[in-house]
């Protein structure tokens, strides 16, 4: 009986000392493949973000992916056979609720003109301007549109025209950078005063890629939300892709995505 009591005492002693091991008393989520704790500085400090899914960017709508018949579904009476119907699977994606309007593209031009205000970048500014002469055609009276459509406030919310594929692609890149820059400012990871000094920054302006690569030096402000921490549990003032805070790159939709959304599968 004394031996049993002695062994029980030893077991209780080990149980009581369990909390004294160099592992955190705080309950953590554990890895299903190793059993090690996530977000525990005493167990390697591997960080798992609480973010579960991507947030919706400004002006975007979520489109649930699926399968549809892409191409002509009616009889090809001309016999061209240049749009053969086929089943296509589309992954879920986000798309604008409406077309990019004149005012949105003028916002883009305004940023370029301020950021690249040195005369040496005149070609950069000119390359971004839309071709307003697309309204001109034989036997037409579209001169008022040539002069007013892009700039006049009455056409602010009309779709921008005269934009090439390259210009549209550059606009997407710019838009993604501006959205992510604002996210960092709102979280206190970039000082908002830097938004006031975009003039003349040129190649030194914020881009998502340069930020993630550590090439963009931003003066942080006080974090307004739950502070990010590093593997040692210390606060950090930079964001990684794994945090799930920044938006993915913006891009133009593929032909399949465009047709899928246009057919109303949203």
Regions found by a protein language model. Give the residues of each.
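Active-site microenvironments of metalloenzymes and redox enzymes
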Residues: 19, 72, 93-266
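Post-signal peptide N-terminal segment of mature Sec-exported envelope proteins
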Residues: 24-53, 61
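C-terminal motif of bacterial Sec signal peptides marking the signal peptidase cleavage site
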Residues: 14-16
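Mature N-terminal segment immediately following signal peptide/propeptide cleavage
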Residues: 54-73
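Sec-dependent signal peptide recognition
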Residues: 2-7
């Amino acid at each position: 009986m004394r031996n049993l009591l002695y062994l029980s005492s030893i077991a209780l002693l080990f149980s009581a000392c369990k909390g004294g091991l160099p592992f955190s008393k705080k309950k953590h989520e554990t890895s299903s493949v190793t059993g090690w704790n996530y977000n525990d500085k005493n167990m390697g400090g591997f960080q798992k973000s609480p973010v579960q899914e991507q947030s919706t960017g400004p002006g975007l709508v979520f489109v649930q992916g699926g399968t549809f018949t892409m191409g002509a579904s009616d009889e090809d009476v001309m016999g061209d056979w240049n749009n053969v119907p086929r089943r296509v699977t589309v992954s879920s994606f986000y798309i604008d609720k409406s077309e990019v309007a004149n005012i949105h593209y003028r916002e883009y031009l305004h940023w370029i003109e301020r950021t690249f205000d040195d005369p040496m970048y005149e070609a950069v500014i000119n390359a971004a301007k839309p071709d307003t002469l697309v309204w001109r055609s034989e036997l037409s009276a579209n001169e008022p549109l040539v002069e007013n459509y892009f700039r006049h406030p009455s056409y602010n919310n009309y779709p921008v025209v005269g934009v090439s594929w390259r210009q549209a692609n550059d606009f997407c890149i710019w838009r993604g950078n501006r959205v992510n820059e604002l996210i960092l400012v709102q979280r206190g990871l970039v000082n908002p005063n830097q938004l006031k000094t975009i003039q003349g920054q040129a190649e030194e302006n914020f881009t998502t890629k340069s930020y993630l690569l550590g090439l963009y030096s931003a003066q942080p402000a006080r974090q307004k939300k739950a502070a990010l921490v590093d593997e040692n549990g210390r606060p950090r003032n930079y964001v990684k892709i794994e945090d799930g805070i920044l938006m993915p790159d913006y891009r133009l939709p593929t032909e399949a995505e465009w047709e899928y959304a246009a057919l109303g599968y949203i």
